[in-house]
């Protein structure tokens, strides 16, 4: 993109880190958040205002971002067509260790009756960190092959719809949490992210 072109909108596909401030969740317009910091820097460079279209949710993996891009009409019908650049900021949740398959964990809210759901949720919250400490995590939340596949689909879809607009990706972030007391999969996920980005000629920001 030449310096004479005006950058107006940046589409950010993210997870909870896109709206998580130092003390917790904040409004998506908070200037401390990385999508808004990036937009501010881009605005200075191009000399025109830049707005962020943030599509993110707590716990989102690359699969969820793909679903949002292809199933949410606001995203594929409004945000993507007007985007001058796309930031792919998912993949960090994919690498988190898990003690049960993700589809089972995500199915807990649908359990009925309510007492069964509440008991199952408490049991999971009590046992999962202990099992993770003991095992380092039996599996990832999403296999690396699936992460690469969904990220590739996102890039291909953006390029098919919006041509050669800039696409930037971010490496999986390190994490420190009592719920995920393991860095077991981080180094591999980070290395895989660089390999994936190189294969599709996508610039990667190392966080």
Task: Name each region found by the language model.
Residues 59-71:
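Structural motif
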Residues 22-28, 64-67, 179-184:
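Short, solvent-exposed loop/turn segments at secondary-structure boundaries
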């Amino acid at each position: 993109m030449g310096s004479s072109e005006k950058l107006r909108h940046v589409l950010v596909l993210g997870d909870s880190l896109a709206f998580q401030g130092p003390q917790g969740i904040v409004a998506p317009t908070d200037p401390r958040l990385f999508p808004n910091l990036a937009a501010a820097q881009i605005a200075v460079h191009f000399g025109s205002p830049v707005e962020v279209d943030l599509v993110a949710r707590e716990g989102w993996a690359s699969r969820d971002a793909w679903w949002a891009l292809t199933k949410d009409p606001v995203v594929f019908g409004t945000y993507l067509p007007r985007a001058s650049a796309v930031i792919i900021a998912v993949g960090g949740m994919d690498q988190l260790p898990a003690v049960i398959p993700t589809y089972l964990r995500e199915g807990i809210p649908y359990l009925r009756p309510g007492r069964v759901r509440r008991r199952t949720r408490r049991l999971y919250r009590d046992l999962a960190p202990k099992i993770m400490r003991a095992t380092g995590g039996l599996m990832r939340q999403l296999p690396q092959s699936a992460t690469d596949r969904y990220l590739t689909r996102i890039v291909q879809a953006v390029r098919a719809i919006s041509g050669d607009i800039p696409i930037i990706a971010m490496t999986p972030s390190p994490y420190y949490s009592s719920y995920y007391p393991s860095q077991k999969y981080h180094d591999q996920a980070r290395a895989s992210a660089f390999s994936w980005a190189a294969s599709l000629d996508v610039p990667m920001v190392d966080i």
